[in-house]
A protein has these predicted regions:
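Structural signature of the two symmetry-related core transmembrane helices
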Residues: 69-83
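Helix-loop boundary and gating motifs at the non-cytosolic
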Residues: 1-47, 204-212, 216-227
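Residue-level signature of mid-helix packing/kink "hotspots" within the transmembrane helices
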Residues: 47-55, 138-139, 143
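Symmetry-related core transmembrane helices of the 12-TM Major Facilitator Superfamily/SLC fold
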Residues: 157-174
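Juxtamembrane intracellular "pre-TM" segments in multi-pass secondary transporters
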Residues: 1, 176-211
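Helix-loop junctions at membrane interfaces in 12-TM secondary transporters
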Residues: 2-4, 86-98
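Cytoplasmic helix-loop-helix junction between adjacent transmembrane helices
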Residues: 98-134
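Helix-to-loop junctions at the C-terminal end of transmembrane segments
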Residues: 51-66, 149-150
């Protein structure tokens, strides 16, 4: 299996999870007796927290020798978080677990994008090819889960995203190429934060970030309460 196919499989799993969690999580929360306000808090908290968790996880990921190592670990964390949300009762424990699972799931996509871009430049394939596999998977599981929920219990939602997290972890550890994070020795934590600081003070970069954030905020509301 070449690197493009391996990354295509990774994106199928990634978007196979988000194609269920984004539109159907609120349906599961409602079945647990949560109010609309509580559901909004649960869905919004990981996205607001991403202002901090996103950069920190990026710096953390650059501390590994290979790009696939943090992807595998985050897949496992995603499974544990979503699985814990399904097993625990009470708003607070469920909120903490969902925050952990959703934060890990969100970080997996940009980390996979970085790996894919590096491999595409090295091996000569088009980035859109494996990424497109993920888009197809998103639509397919979205429609498939919607049809399944006409007959199945809503708990299948949490079971699905938990299993997807485990599949991502196994696939990353065993099948993704062992692309190094950088040439030579691993960067010290201080040097990794210095690179982050240069981005934060770049006005063009920050303007783009705020623009993308506005788009994502609109998507979040639409997806979160679409079911």
């Amino acid at each position: 299996m070449n690197s493009a196919a391996r990354m295509g499989l990774q994106y199928v799993l990634l978007f196979g999870a988000s194609g269920v969690s984004l539109p159907f999580a609120s349906l599961w929360f409602r079945a647990q007796g949560l109010s609309g306000a509580q559901i909004g808090v649960l869905l919004a908290a990981p996205m607001l927290g991403r202002i901090v968790t996103g950069p920190l996880l990026a710096v953390w990921a650059d501390g590994f020798r290979t790009r696939r190592a943090p992807i595998a670990l985050l897949g496992l964390v995603m499974a544990l978080g979503y699985g814990g949300a399904g097993l625990l009762d009470g708003f607070a424990p469920r909120a903490v677990c969902w925050f952990i699972g959703a934060t890990a799931a969100a970080a997996l996509i940009p980390l996979s994008d970085v790996l894919t871009l590096r491999l595409a430049a090295r091996d000569g394939f088009t980035f859109a090819l494996p990424r497109g596999c993920g888009s197809v998977a998103f639509v397919a599981v979205n429609v498939g889960m919607g049809a399944l929920l006409l007959k199945a219990e809503v708990d299948v939602i949490v079971v699905w995203v938990t299993l997807m997290g485990l599949a991502i972890a196994v696939t990353a550890a065993l099948f993704l190429p062992g692309e190094p994070v950088g040439e030579g020795a691993t960067l010290r934590k201080r040097d990794r934060f210095r690179g982050l600081g240069r981005l934060v003070v770049d006005p063009v970069f920050m303007t783009a970030i705020f623009a993308v954030g506005a788009v994502q905020a609109a998507h979040a509301f639409q997806y979160g309460f679409s079911a």
